Structures are given as C-alpha cells and as structure tokens.
Amino acid sequence: MTMLKDPSKKYRAFPTIDLPDRTWPSKTITQAPIWCSSDLRDGNQSLIEPMDSEKKLRFWKTLVQVGVKEIEASFPSASQTDFDFVRTLIQDGHIPDDTTIQVLTQAREDLIARTFESLRGAKKAIVHLYNATSPSFRRIVFNQDKQGVKDIAVNAAKLFVKYAAQQPETQWTFQYSPETFSATEMEFAKEVCDAVIEVWNPTPEHKIILNLPATVEVSTPNIYADQIEWFCRNVSRRDSVIISLHCHNDRGTGIAATELGLMAGADRAEGCLFGNGERTGNVDLVTLALNLYTQGIDPLLDFSDIDGVRKVVEECNQLPVHPRHPYVGDLVHTAFSGSHQDAIRKGFAKQQDGELWEVPYLPIDPADIGRSYEAVIRVNSQSGKGGITYLLEQEYGISLPRRMQIEFSQVVQGETDRLGLEMTAQQIYSLLHKEYLQANAPYALVSHRLQEENGHSAVEVEVAGEGETTLHWRGKGNGALEALVAGLPIAVEIMDYNEHAIGAGTNAKAAAYIELRVAGGRPVHGVGIDENITTASFKALFSALNRSLSQQEAKAA
C-alpha cells in the first residue's frame, strides 16, 4: 500500500472554531503556569519496560528537586505496584509540604474507591477523573450517546465527593479531564464539564481543575488555542476553575499548542520531562520552562544541572534523549559550520557579565543550565577559521592573528577532509604544533645571544643546518627581530608581527606570530612559544622561514 494521490478520500481537515474576536494572538506569556509532571503515570505507561519502584522513587525525587509542585505519581487502581508506590510516598515521607501528589482513576466505583484508599494519610492530594468525550470514542469505543457519556462523568464525580468525605484529614483537589477534548464538539465538552462543576461545587477559595487534553493532536496549534479561549469564556464558574492543558505531540507541535493555550487563558500545564509519553510523547516540560527562561520569565523550575536531570530520565525511562533535543541534546549548543562558529566566537568576545545575552546562534547561555563551553564549537570538514580559533583560544590560550587564522584553517580543512572525521581541540593543537612549532628544517634555532649597543641590538644565533652543519649568523638592527633579519643569509620581509602572553604569573609563556615573505614570495606564517618573548619571536621567525623554504622546494619539485 502506498500514499494516496488524493488523501482527502481518507482524511479530512479538523474543523476550525468560529471565534472571530479571539484575543490570544495579541497576548504574551508573562508568568510560568502551574506545572504538573505526568512522567510517573502517562510517561511510565508508555515505556517498553515500565519503571520499578526504585526507579520511580528516584524519578520522584528528581522532580521534587527540580521544583515540580504537582506530580502525577501513578494509576493506583491499575496494579498493586502502582498502589504500593503511592503508599510508599505517603508513609515514608517523600512528599514535601509544598508538593501535591496526583493520581488518576477511571470512572468506575471500584476503581475510585481503590484510588482514594491509596491516598489515605496524605496531607493533600489531587484525584484525577477522566472519560473520553469525542464522537469517535462515543461511537466506536463505548457505543454511548452524549447523555450516556455525560452520565458517566457526573456519576463518577458524585463518587469523588462520597469517598473524599470519608477521609476528611486530607485536603482534596478534584480534577476532571474530558479525554480527547480537542476532538470533541466544544458545546458538548462544556456541557459535560459544567455538569461536573455542578456536582463538585467549587469556589474561588477551593478550586477544581479542568484538564483539557489534546489526547491526540488533530489540528494546528492555533485551533487548539481557539478551543481553549472559547472554553475559558463559556465554562461556568471560571473563577473557581483552574484550566489545565495536556498536549501530546502527534503532529510535532505540542510545545506550540501548549504555549498558545496558555496565551488563550489556561493556568496549568501537564507534561513529561524531555517529552516522554504515549506515541510521539507528551509535551516537554523542560522545553516549555526554558522557553520562558529565555524570554526573561522565571519558570519556577530549576534546570541548573540539566545533564544530571537527563541522566536520571534516560536511566529510568531506558530511552535516550535525542542529540538535537532542545536545550539538552548533545549537539544543541554545538556549531560545526564555519560562519556559525565565527559569529559565536565574536559573540563570546563581546559578551560581558551582567549584560543581556546576545551571542549569535545560542538562545541560552549554556552555563545557565550547567553546560560548559567546551562543546559549543566543534570542527569538521564544514568548519571555518572561527571554530578553530575559538577552540585554540579556549583550550590553549592561543590567539591566532586574523590572516593566520585563514592559513591554518586550510591546513585543518585538509586534515578533516583526509580523515572524514570531527577534530577535537587536542587534535587541532597537535596539528598546529606539527605544522608550525616543529618546522625545524632546513634551519633550526639552537641558541642566541643578544646585546644592546648604543640603542641598537646586536644578535648572534647558532643554527643547526642541513647535514649536521652548525651555522652562526650575526646581525644588527633597531630591535632584536630586526637584527636577526639583518643577519639572515636570505632576503626576508616581515609583513606582520603579533605577540601575547599565555597564562599568567610565573608560569606564563609568550606566543609570537610572524608573517613574512622570503625572496619576494608569497606570505607565510610562523609561530613560536617560549618563556622568553625574544626567544618566542625568534622561534616564530624560524618557523615561518622554514615553512616558506619547504613550500618553495615542494613547488619546485
């Protein structure tokens, strides 16, 4: 079977919402929503191998540490394991006073009773009721009409009131989800929710939660936002209701749908860390939170050690986080492209502490989430001088002059093309060392003696020449380097000279860079590093001289 030439024969677009006076497009998110993690319930039930109790507890502690204040821990009536986990959390004191446990139940009395029993002794708890309301579920799954579906919700809501009254020591919050809300007729979704509200009788001081799931994404995010705004306008007792979002990612727009839903008036967001969940996953709470953070809004969640959080999630879920996953993937703060690397390097050079973050290609400072800058720039065959320069500066304190950056990038490019692999900072430095610092033939500097005479410099150098010969060159000039050039037996023109310190204090070294031409040839660069700046400059000159002569010899051959 292949894709249809006319998909309209099999699929149809989801209808839009008639909301010409919608207001959400002109709004912005100005504060973090109430966060609820469903990792231990919705996320766990979607795993190939669900978490055992030990992993669940480890995950719970991570969520608490991050700052999630409402955590859906399990489906207590589904299994003894889930029931026992809730009991462990309560009896062993794993629920902080500022954190609320949430559990889920279907709309059957035996399951509801079991769910409330699992929460006995909890200081406070959210009990989450759901039943599907969309036309396809009514027709295909339940064979129920609208009244039948509404009756299921209302009868279960009454049972919530009954069983909660038997445990008055717990501060209860009731939550109702018209499952498949986004595929349900809005008038009917409102009708069912209004009926549940009537039973639970919330007040502004004691609110209930209405959770409005995009159980399966069926439309573009703007339609979901229209649904949320319409619902917020029309639901009864809006001031006594917390509107919650629960988006999945079937169309790849769960983040956008949630953000637009918050703009449309929602108060709360349910999801999972890094987007685990059924099928394509629940909305990713980490991305939502850090999207707020990068807009200057406190997300009320702490991902200062994002790699530590990822490690727990990967080990508990036994699923890897994609290397391109926003904010946390191994490659999301990495640039291979030469133009990107150059822009990032320049951005880092200009960025000052306390200023607004404006480094090109990096929407967040990796350091804010516990990332180092070491992986920001990596070098492969697509890389340019910016990335190479950045790595040498950051790892080895070597700042190549601009024209030398261009020359050395060609050397690196040739090596990456030859290897077909990425190069590390250490490999790049080794290549620099081999190409420039070990350029000792045909002339190797052995020693030098410098004297100042009447404001002029006199230099004598001992040089190891070809065939184990020892040469002595002498010259005078206005400075040490000019004196050395004057003493060379070859016509050399210095085009550019740069120097800087590597490190600080007594262990500091000097780096010198020379660009020269030999006998009117093309410019060539050399590098010298030494504790003594004069020695470093002499080494740089010999480096450039030898490289130029070797290139001329190779060209002649």
Swiss-Prot record:
Catalysed conversion reaction: 3-methyl-2-oxobutanoate + acetyl-CoA + H2O = (2S)-2-isopropylmalate + CoA + H(+)
GO cellular component: cytoplasm
Family indicated by similarity: Belongs to the alpha-IPM synthase/homocitrate synthase family. LeuA type 2 subfamily.
Keyword check for Cytoplasm: yes
Documented EC number(s): 2.3.3.13
Cofactor: Mg(2+)
Encoding gene, per UniProt annotation: leuA
Gene3D superfamilies linked to this entry: 3.30.160.270, Aldolase class I (3.20.20.70)
GO biological process: L-leucine biosynthetic process
Functional description taken from the UniProt entry: Catalyzes the condensation of the acetyl group of acetyl-CoA with 3-methyl-2-oxobutanoate (2-ketoisovalerate) to form 3-carboxy-3-hydroxy-4-methylpentanoate (2-isopropylmalate).
Intracellular or extracellular location(s): Cytoplasm
Keyword vocabulary terms for this entry: Amino-acid biosynthesis, Branched-chain amino acid biosynthesis, Cytoplasm, Leucine biosynthesis, Magnesium, Metal-binding, Transferase
HAMAP family: LeuA_type2
Predominant place of localization: cytoplasm
Positions of region (Regulatory domain): 439-557
Residue numbers binding Mg(2+): 42, 246, 248, 282
Protein's UniProt keywords contain Membrane: no
PANTHER family: 2-ISOPROPYLMALATE SYNTHASE, PTHR46911
Single Gene Ontology MF annotation: acetyl-CoA C-acetyltransferase activity
Subunit organization: Homodimer.
InterPro entries according to UniProt: 2-isopropylmalate_synth_dimer (IPR013709), AIPM/Hcit_synth_CS (IPR002034), Aldolase_TIM (IPR013785), IPM_Synthase (IPR005668), LeuA-like_post-cat (IPR054692), LeuA_allosteric_dom_sf (IPR036230), LeuA_N_DRE-TIM (IPR039371), PYR_CT (IPR000891)
Record-given protein name: 2-isopropylmalate synthase
